[in-house]
């Protein structure tokens, strides 16, 4: 297995797909890396030479923010929004959708599992004996 940016890339995958296993690298950036290093995107990870793996690793570590650094930056951005009490920060704090989605229905992923309220007895429903 080739190790790039602290991640073991799967051997049997194509290079363009395997690079996407790294947090912060998607299809566009993966293709850009392959073009810049003039590698074959259809080449399997197990067929890469040590020199090619080293070139990929150097390019990613020098030019891109990936994995732990990127996760830390995203978390600090969210924390900053919460601290300055912006609308987006309040939505994050309350675990509600941040980008304007409706919440009357849907938003189950963000709001969590439904809480069912049991039928309780009200004082007016109890019969009074005189």
Curated annotation (Swiss-Prot):
MF terms (GO), sorted A to Z: rRNA binding; structural constituent of ribosome; tRNA binding
Biased composition (Polar residues): 121-130
Chain intervals with Basic residues compositional bias: 97-116
Gene3D superfamilies: 1.10.8.50, 30s ribosomal protein s13, domain 2
GO biological process: translation
Keywords linked to the UniProt accession: Ribonucleoprotein, Ribosomal protein, RNA-binding, rRNA-binding, tRNA-binding
Keyword Endoplasmic reticulum attached: no
Protein name: Small ribosomal subunit protein uS13
Native organism: Endomicrobium trichonymphae
Classification lineage: Bacteria, Pseudomonadati, Elusimicrobiota, Endomicrobiia, Endomicrobiales
């Amino acid at each position: 297995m080739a190790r790039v940016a602290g991640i073991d890339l799967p051997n049997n995958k194509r290079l363009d797909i395997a690079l996407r296993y790294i947090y912060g690298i998607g299809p566009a950036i993966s293709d850009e890396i392959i073009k810049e290093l003039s590698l074959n995107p259809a080449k399997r990870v197990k067929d890469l030479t040590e020199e090619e793996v080293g070139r990929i690793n150097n390019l990613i570590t020098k030019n891109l923010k990936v994995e732990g650094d990127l996760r830390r930056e995203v978390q600090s951005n969210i924390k900053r929004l919460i601290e300055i009490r912006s609308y987006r920060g309040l939505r994050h704090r309350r675990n509600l959708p941040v980008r304007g989605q409706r919440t009357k229905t849907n938003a189950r992923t963000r709001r969590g599992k439904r809480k069912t309220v049991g039928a309780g007895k009200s004082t007016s429903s109890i019969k009074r004996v005189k």
